[in-house]
Structure formats: C-alpha cells, structure tokens
Design a protein with these regions (language model features):
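Short, surface-exposed linear motifs at loops/turns and structural transition points
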Residues: 1-57
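Residues that act as N-cap/strand-start positions at coil-to-secondary-structure junctions
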Residues: 11-13, 46, 90, 173, ...
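Zymogen propeptides
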Residues: 57-197
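Short glycine-rich loop/turn motifs
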Residues: 90-95, 176, 237-239, 275-280, ...
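Structural recognition of the beta-strand scaffold that forms the well-ordered cores
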Residues: 96, 130-134, 178-180, 188-190, ...
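Short acidic-glycine loop/turn motifs at beta-strand connectors
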Residues: 99-102, 140, 180-188, 243-246, ...
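Active-site-adjacent helix-turn-beta-strand microarchitecture at beta-sheet edges
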Residues: 141-268
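Conserved, well-ordered active-site substructure
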Residues: 141-170, 257-320, 329-359
C-alpha cells in the first residue's frame, strides 16, 4: 500500500511523518519505508525498510458507578454517577447512555439563529429533551462542522490560525473528529475534511498533521486516504478523537515541543494538556451513545488528563469516543434535576450542545 506523504520540506530540516493507531492492528508487525519521486531519474527512491508494531494499549480505567434515579426519564435513558478517586485524585463524573434507535440523538446549534445559550436554556427551549451536554470548542466561532437534519448548519471553520492556536504561525490542513447518527439512528465516527464550503469527505483515519512536523495538502476524495460513505443526519465535530475502533488515539509523547498525536493541531495547553473539567461523546460496541462529563479544578474533583479521559471512555465500553469542549463550558442537564455537575458561578453560554430527546 502506497500512502501519499506530506509536502516535501523547503529546507534540509528533518520532519516526522506519523502513522495513526487507527491504521494499525496491534497484533501485526508492519514493514514500512519512505519514498520520494526523483525527477532526474524518473523513478521512486526508497528508504531502508523499518519494522514497526503498535505499542501495547493502555488499560481502560474502570470506576465504581451508581445509577441515578430520575422519574422524568424514560427507561431507555440511564444516568450514572461516580464519586471516587482516580490516579490518587478525587474524581466526580456522570454519564448518560441510550440507544439512538429508542430515543433521538440530536445536535443543537443556537448560533444558527444568532445567539449563544446555556446548556439548560437550550434543553428547556427544545421542549422534549432528556439529557443534554455542551458541544464543540469555540472561540469567535465553533471549531469544526455541525450537521442538523442532514444539512451543514454552520459555516465550516476548520482552519488552524496561528493567532489563535499554538501552530508556529503557519496554516496546517487538518481533519476533524466527528460523531453523529444517520436518519435511522445508526451512529458513526469519522474524521471530516472540508476542502471548500459544502464539500465533505469522511475518513476512517486522520490526516496526521503535527505542528512543526509534516504538513499536508488539502483533503480530497482520495487524500489523505480514500474517503468513506456516510450520510449523517445529526453530527458534531470537535476533538481530538480519543478512542477509535477500540484503540486509544492520544498520549503525551512529543516531537520537539508539540504532542505527536495532536493530529488536529489543537491548542496544547487549552485542550491537549491539563486536567480540567471534561466533556466527551462516545459510541459503544453495540451502537449506544454515551454522554460524559466530569468536574475539575475543585478539591472534590481534580478532573482528567486527555489520555485518562480516553481510558475512562474505553472503560465505559466505548469503541469510539471524542473530546468535546471542557473547562468552564462543561455541563450536563438532566430532565428533572436540571444541571447535575458542579459550577461555582454562572453557567457559560455555549454555541452548541448534543444529547437525547423524545422520538
């Protein structure tokens, strides 16, 4: 298999080209070599062969969960809470789980009508919501694409801008993690690339952009990999992808001063590092959807590092999982009690949410 590589560096600088875990089977040894087209000889030049194998996967984190009883929820929606310790730290978290064939999974985007709203306001305004969590990371706009009722709701903002993200003041073409459901309630998880407005390509592996390393051309039907067919009815993109096909996609290994698995070029301090409040969205082996939040930055709960969040989601049975906006944006609303996680001041208004609704 020949994979098209990154742009050739303009200087003699050595760059790393990475192979994501999503493309590797941990039980298989692979033989790889780099290649480049040589114009003078009219043929490919190949490097020596290297042998690689996916490193052993981190163990899932299993916590003690208690089912919460809320009379206004249907039996198809379950909510669980843990008040425990993780890696020696206090840890409080909640997750809701449901089959999207029994209840609706939807994405709400109030910015489409020109406003930001709290999670609770979005849930209440919907009228038929059971559980709702905050959605995509945002600055002046949501980062990524949002699909509602089969159409792109917001303008695509996939660029990584040096003035906003820590990307050495260069533009990196990327793909974004996305999770959603089709019109029949079948969940899917992919990376989405959008070369231009209203042109979507979905992939089962990410473009492996790494700040200061490989830079890639814009996506196409065949680049960085052949795209896959997917027709989401409701979907939200954020990231990074935490778990894909059962494999944990994130760690804290570095290339220079940047994280090697930060393929989507997220801000390292604000997203990739630290242990703040976290929000995540997952899909289990049997097609259920998991909505997760944890408290952070308080004595009662010290939050989760990104690799820990991936291990937690895998421990909940997620075959696929994606990080959502965290920190002050983290919030879970449940019909009956309202907001269930901790907040020491007013709830932040957010630009998108996702959750479970009546069919």
């Amino acid at each position: 298999v020949k994979l098209k590589g990154p742009a050739f560096p303009s200087s003699s600088k050595t760059i790393k080209q990475l192979i994501p875990a999503s493309r590797l089977n941990p039980s298989i040894q692979y033989y790889i070599r780099a290649y480049v087209w040589d114009n003078s000889s009219g043929k490919y030049i190949y490097s020596d062969v290297s042998q690689i194998q996916l490193a052993a996967q981190p163990e899932p984190i299993s916590l003690s969960w208690t089912e919460e009883s809320y009379s206004e929820l249907p039996s198809a929606v379950k909510v669980y809470k843990t008040t425990s310790t993780m890696e020696g730290r206090n840890f409080n978290a909640w997750y809701a789980i449901a089959d999207p064939k029994e209840v609706d999974f939807r994405v709400i985007y109030p910015e489409a009508v020109g406003s930001k709203q709290t999670v609770a306001t979005q849930a209440t305004n919907a009228g038929d919501c059971y559980v709702l969590i905050n959605g995509a990371i945002f600055g002046n706009y949501n980062i990524g694409a949002i699909i509602t009722e089969g159409s792109m709701t917001q303008q695509w903002h996939g660029e990584i801008e040096g003035c906003y993200w820590a990307t050495d003041n260069q533009l990196y073409n990327i793909t974004r993690a996305m999770i959603g459901v089709d019109s029949n309630g079948n969940p899917g998880a992919y990376w989405v690339g959008v070369p231009s407005q209203n042109r979507f390509f979905y992939y089962s592996s990410p473009m492996t952009s790494v700040v200061g390393q490989a830079k890639y051309d814009s996506v196409s039907e065949t680049y960085p990999y052949p795209c896959v067919e997917w027709d989401p009815y409701y979907a939200i993109s954020c990231g990074p992808m935490l778990v894909y096909d059962g494999k944990i996609m994130v760690d804290h290994s570095k290339a220079g001063s940047h994280y090697m698995t930060n393929y989507e070029c997220w801000d390292a301090n604000g997203v990739y590092y630290g242990n703040p409040d976290r929000t995540a969205l997952g899909v289990t082996e049997d097609g259920k959807i998991v909505l997760f939040v944890c408290d952070g930055r308080i004595d009662a709960s010290k939050g989760a590092y990104l690799p820990e969040l991936a291990r937690i989601m895998k421990g909940l049975g997620c075959k696929y999982a994606m990080n959502l906006d965290g920190g002050g944006s983290t919030g879970m609303w449940v019909k009956g009690p309202g907001m269930v996680n901790y907040k020491d001041d007013s709830w932040r208004t957010v630009k998108s949410t996702c959750g479970f609704f009546a069919k």
